[in-house]
Amino acid sequence: MIIPVRCFSCGRVIASDYGRYIKRVNEIKAEGRDPSPEEIEKIFDDLGIERYCCRRMIVSHVDLISEIMPFS
């Protein structure tokens, strides 16, 4: 669905970082491969997302809006 605006655990604003995270991951996927855990960690470090709770919010988010829209 839609990414939560704030981290559920610490309250840090994460919605603004989600788009940049997805853009960087898609750049890696455009090369024909999945990002490695080290690359994901570097993306988070570059974005300034240090807490594991915030990282969890972004990594575990599943965007289902495109799958749900045909049923509305």
UniProtKB/Swiss-Prot annotation:
Enzymatic class: transferase
Record Pfam families: RNA_pol_N
The enzyme's E.C. designation: 2.7.7.6
GO biological process, one term: DNA-templated transcription
Molecular-function annotations in GO: DNA binding; DNA-directed RNA polymerase activity; zinc ion binding
InterPro entries referenced in this protein's UniProt entry, alphabetically: RNA_pol_su_RPB10, RNA_pol_suN_Zn-BS, RPABC5/Rpb10
Catalytic activity: RNA(n) + a ribonucleoside 5'-triphosphate = RNA(n+1) + diphosphate
Family statement drawn from the similarity comment of this UniProt entry: Belongs to the archaeal Rpo10/eukaryotic RPB10 RNA polymerase subunit family.
Main location: cytoplasm
Keyword terms of this UniProt record: Cytoplasm, DNA-directed RNA polymerase, Metal-binding, Nucleotidyltransferase, Transcription, Transferase, Zinc
Provenance organism: Thermoplasma acidophilum (strain ATCC 25905 / DSM 1728 / JCM 9062 / NBRC 15155 / AMRC-C165)
Localization in the cell: Cytoplasm
Assembly notes: Part of the RNA polymerase complex.
Keyword presence, Nucleus: no
Cofactor binding mode and count: Binds 1 zinc ion.
Cofactor requirements of the protein: Zn(2+)
Function, in words: DNA-dependent RNA polymerase (RNAP) catalyzes the transcription of DNA into RNA using the four ribonucleoside triphosphates as substrates.
UniProt xrefs under HAMAP family: RNApol_arch_Rpo10
UniProt name for this protein: DNA-directed RNA polymerase subunit Rpo10
